[in-house]
């Protein structure tokens, strides 16, 4: 099985889910109206998608840490490592804020925005690059 293809596919799904997270929160904040359902239903979906994203990111991170070879001379690889590390750190911080640090809740939208930016950066520097090479150059990266 091509683990890099699986990681790139999961990362792409994660980016789509992150876009859904943003749209759900925009509707919960009353900025747009796209999805049917009550606020409680949309909040439930936002939380469940977040749970799925956490599982996807932890699975991808595990394989990145245990299987990948880091090229310290590649700015793409280094930026991907930074995006990924910050992403997991901010996810942990958001979980702490939502569950136990209610004094920071007024900033949760900023934390969510940071998560979206970091997700986009991590996915584009990995899956985006993988699919670009595959499509444009006919090269499939393998471990």
Where are these regions (language model features)?
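Membrane-embedded alpha-helical bundles that constitute the cytochrome b-like, heme-associated redox core
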Residues: 1-143
